[in-house]
Amino acid sequence: MRFRHKAAALAATLALPLAGLVGLASPAQAATSATATFAKTSDWGTGFGGSWTVKNTGTTSLSSWTVEWDFPTGTKVTSAWDATVTNSGDHWTAKNVGWNGTLAPGASVSFGFNGSGPGSPSNCKLNGGSCDGTSVPGDAAPSAPGTPTASNITDTSVKLSWSAATDDKGVKNYDVLRDGAKVATVTGTTYTDNGLTKGTAYSYSVKARDTADQTGPASGAVKVTTTGGGDGGNPGTGAEVKMGYFTNWGVYGRNYHVKNLVTSGSADKITHINYAFGNVQGGKCTIGDSYADYDKAYTADQSVDGVADTWDQPLRGNFNQLRKLKAKYPNIKILYSFGGWTWSGGFPDAVKNPAAFAKSCHDLVEDPRWADVFDGIDLDWEYPNACGLSCDETSAPNAFSSMMKAMRAEFGQDYLITAAVTADGSDGGKIDAADYGEASKYIDWYNVMTYDFFGAWAKNGPTAPHSPLTAYDGIPQQGFNTADAMAKFKSKGVPADKLLIGIGFYGRGWTGVTQSAPGGTATGPATGTYEAGIEDYKVLKNSCPATGTIAGTAYAHCGSNWWSYDTPATIKSKMDWAEQQGLGGAFFWEFSGDTANGDWWRHRQRPQVTPAVRTTRRH
């Protein structure tokens, strides 16, 4: 799909408050409490504007203030106002000037600066105390508790025990962390975690909190696998998998966040999420959007668990919200998807050394900051030995299978490895261009992109459904339908239960159309909310309801506009067909296109459906 990937995400970022406000509260003096709040006020690419606000939250006057913080190497203050700002290397100090040092209770003052570089402040102190309110000068945080031991392990529960932490003022309680996210706070040194999934691996650690509400470092981690279970997540016949791709750029203009999976009810029904996208460049897997992925701060009302991010926590953004989602729904497994329509141009260089490429992907997926978030990897190369946004003219015929073989060797058998693949079933088309049959030995399943067969990139038409299940009289291109694509994959030796059918939460359309049935002429793409020629299902179901069906999908003629999209009824017919064919299930693109109450999920008819969110693209 021609969604706005990096460029659009950045543009949307610039249109929003880039950093938001991150509260950094701290008792600044024994008798006077104060908070320091940082905000990035602007960003022009090579530099940014920032401000700090100091507020007296205590009951007595504050006579002076000093704010300290660290910037990463390469980020610095270039000019400042309303404070005296100095630095020693990467450590920066701002002190009040003569007129703004005294703050009455409830009063606040701000100072600003311009900076260069991409970094954000860390290790903040206000008048010697920590800016997040967890310490006061002269008061030490508690020590780390002992590494927990696990006992009484069942299909759904485990008992944890640990040795006590020490503190100069006494320990108040302990936070129990499952896979990095807090699941309980207890006053003793034991805890039984219930409601787990059988045959599933978890990691537990503990943090102590003292009577001054300071939190100490985490204990060592103990790994626990519940009893029971099956084959570790491989879908087999597909009856188990209910997957969805979540897009990192959706947090901008679409305002769709991980918490929406909870409020829509989708999280109650899915088993897998593909997180899209990481980039492929320089022969390596790389981060796609660092701000959305792990830096964006979430307020309490935006957060999955209702707890706001702090300015100095080691992981924020979507990755941390996904971690919280897994804590709330421990059955959900998450895969990191790399490439996509926009970022597939790096694959030809990467597969020149498949082992090195696979290692780079493993190192990124298993980065210690988020190693507990991801359970596998999805590769979305569009397309090996063929053309997508760019053309692959250098890869060997076996490049795709060599890549997947290297991925399996690097990640091992305990990780899920999947791939998004073309649905071009035409003679000599994209399926014929790569060795998908050989590669299927190393993957858990293929997400076959059975949509975007036709669209308004052919601005004058003919109008045609973008996701036909079968061929029909007058179809513009033979082989551009789901049935032909699946038949061709099977002929290449791909097992049917490793093939997932793709369905979009959107429609494609033209304007200037007078003919109701498919095959009409047009003058160009219809207007869409985010992109011409494409619109979310949640909009189309009301603005242009379906007026007919063809080849197992729906279409609508409204005024001069003509749209095609799937409805709950056509979804059911496709699921019936997929079951008859022995396919592994289905996936959907993408979560933000669904209604606020998860309309697709409420109408989902069969347990083998594998809803995923994929980017759509031309075949």
From Swiss-Prot:
InterPro entries, sorted: CBD2, CBM2/CBM3_carb-bd_dom_sf, CBM2_carb-bd_dom_sf, CBM2_CS, Chitinase_II/V-like_cat, Chitinase_insertion_sf, FN3_dom, FN3_sf
GO biological process: chitin catabolic process; polysaccharide catabolic process
Domain GH18 intervals: 240-619
Active site (catalytic residues): 382
Keywords (A to Z) from UniProt: Carbohydrate metabolism, Chitin degradation, Chitin-binding, Glycosidase, Hydrolase, Polysaccharide degradation, Signal
Region of interest called Disordered, as start-end residue ranges on this chain: 212-236
Signal peptide: 1-30
Compositional bias segments (type: Gly residues): 227-236
Domain named Fibronectin type-III: residues: 144-229
Induction (record text): By chitin.
Documented EC number(s): 3.2.1.14
Pfam entry (one): fn3
Record protein name field: Chitinase C
Organism encoding this protein: Streptomyces lividans
